[in-house]
Regions:
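"A position-specific structural signal for the A-helix of alpha-solenoid helical repeats
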Residues: 7, 41-44
Length: 80
């Protein structure tokens, strides 16, 4: 179930349906452990909804837990 929630988050995000993406992401967060992909989605959604503290928290987790991931590299590129 948690994988399906993350997939739906990503699909809605790609469709620019950010409100639904946020809803799926919230449900995902309640049921699953974070991975690099979910943290990067969390950063992007938090930025869209101007939740700076949340974006920073997800970014820090991404940096500390998945520093070699493609998602962390994408985060670094987006911060430039």
């Amino acid at each position: 179930q948690s994988r399906a929630l993350l997939e739906m988050t990503d699909i809605r995000f790609q469709q620019r349906n950010y409100v639904e993406a946020q809803g799926f992401y919230s449900r995902y967060n309640q049921s699953a452990r974070q991975n690099a992909r979910s943290l990067w989605l969390g950063v992007q959604l938090a930025r869209i909804f101007d939740q700076q503290d949340e974006a920073a928290s997800y970014a820090l987790l991404l940096k500390n837990i998945f520093p070699a991931s493609a998602e962390y590299k994408a985060y670094l590129d987006s911060a430039r």
